[in-house]
Amino acid sequence: MTIAKELLIKHEIPLPIEDELPLGGEIVSQYLAPLSSLPEFKPHIHLNSKVISIGRKGLDKVKTFGREDIPFVIHVQEGNAFHMYETKAVIDATGTWQNPNPIGSGGIDAEGEQEAKNQIYYGIPDVLGKNRKRYEGKTTLVVGGGHSAINALLELAELQKQNENTKLVWALRKNTLSEAYGGKENDALPARGKLGSRIQELVQTGKVIVHTPLYIHSIQRDSNHKLSVLGVKDDENHMISGIDEIISNTGSRPNFNMLKEIRHASDPSLESVPELAELIDPNIHSCGTVRPHGEKELRQPEKNFYIIGAKSYGRAPTFLLATGYEQARSVVAYLTGDIESSEQVQLRLPETGVCSISNVNKKEATDNASCDSEQLEGKTTVGCC
């Protein structure tokens, strides 16, 4: 980040305002786009390029002798052409956003999900911009209980103010809505806490119909292209009908297809980098606090190959951009020979979120939390997990 800042200053490009919290599009327009256009970077950036596979030159995964001395080969499709690049090291920062989880509650497609895919958006659509016509005056079901779902609902609520025929429906698996609201004003990340407060206010107005806990198993479409979602709620069959569009925010997972010839490891449940699993497991850490980590924790069986960023967290939902920046800094420092710098993890994350002992087994929380046991005696403990 320091080098990027120095280069922007060198080329007299205005820096983003440090005290503002940018939206995703603003990160691109104010920071990534100007940075990528600089002569120091532009020749080395390949857009519209898909990595097909990564491996060692002339060796498959089985071969060991001399493996660490042989360069990596990256096979890339760029438009209609195919290219190969040899490299000393590979950092996989491809994320998980393009590999969303399905709507089915068991981690697999709901019956009929593929047939209804033209009416399902995976991710957060630009509700008030380019996707406006898709949702204005329609009944939209948002599936998911995390911050992405909350963002989508809040955008739809703004659209509802402009067109009262816009209807909002929310389906999630959480036992209580308070779990979705999170820490609110007690969250050490104020902007995230505000999301919880805003969605609670929206629910209390009655302008969004909530179905929870709902475990979806199938989606049906009638002759008028209206969707019905079927599942189980409170041990009984439950159906939501009259749906025009579905926004699916059920999380995402890593895709390892391009790594078939790389010796890589992942946690069996989270699909995260193994050394991170205990730090980020949502079964243990309900509030998402993760201690700082760097190159050492991110090492893979394949020397000089690393998975960083959201993909390093696998299916865990608690990744923060600041974590990824520090991961990248530490790994690059190590690869360039600055071992001392790579070991000095500079990031200090705030104690994020709120641990509710009512939602976590008390003994388990005590055994795994990083706070002392006296803190756990209260019903709610700020930032203890």
What do these predicted regions represent?
Residues 212, 253, 268-385:
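C-terminal, flexible cofactor-proximal segment of oxidoreductases
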Residues 101-103, 152-153, 180, 257-259, ...:
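Short glycine-/acidic-enriched loop or helix-start segments at secondary-structure transitions
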Residues 24, 31, 92-162, 168, ...:
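Glycine-rich dinucleotide-binding loop and its adjacent helix/turn
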